[in-house]
Amino acid sequence: VIDGEKWVAGVEPDRLQGWERGLHGDYPSTKPYKALFYAALLMSEQKEIDVLVTGLPVSQYMDVERREALKSRLEGEHQITPKRSVAVKSVVVVPQPAGAYMDVVSSTKDEDLLEIIQGGKTVVIDPGFFSVDWVALEEGEVRYHSSGTSLKAMSVLLQETDRLIQEDHGGAPGIEKIEKAIRAGKAEIFLYGEKSALD
């Protein structure tokens, strides 16, 4: 429940009618973002979170005020359902791709891989819906001048795919249907009762 309204989160975009994903730089201050945040808190099954780590696109992460605003929104007591609240003691904001790097470093059992990524140079690329972000790391430290963000992200690719399918077939399946097929590893979708290739 957000501001007295019931929300759902974690549902495939094509399952919701009349809903569009926000594609703007202030997404972390929106109700859909808060709904996803609350869903994550609920799924944690915890009453208290000592440290919550979240990410921002690299270009937004570079803005200290934006980082601090997100941190202050997420810290504190959150009433996530009428009978459940979760306290978040501390929030750490990182550049989005750095989270994948930290996950590999903390979870890999491959000593050779760990030696390579901790002692060498690594680039982590995060092709998201809103932005494509990349982080360059050297010996585990982020090199901010070699890291960045592009807004020519998955949303742009999906829109162009939708446009090309419409151009070829006279109808567009919609970006949600295309995205769902790609996530499922499918190379085709149904359009007008026939299979249409995504390549």
Report the location of each language-model feature.
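Nucleotide/phosphate-binding catalytic cleft detector across ATP-hydrolyzing
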Residues: 1-122, 141-155, 168, 176-199
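P-loop NTP-binding/switch modules centered on Walker-like glycine-rich loops
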Residues: 161
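Short beta-strand scaffold segments in enzyme catalytic cores
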Residues: 132-136
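Short, glycine/acidic-enriched loop or turn micro-motifs at the edges of active sites
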Residues: 99, 129-130
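Conserved catalytic-loop position in the HRD/HxD motif
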Residues: 124-128
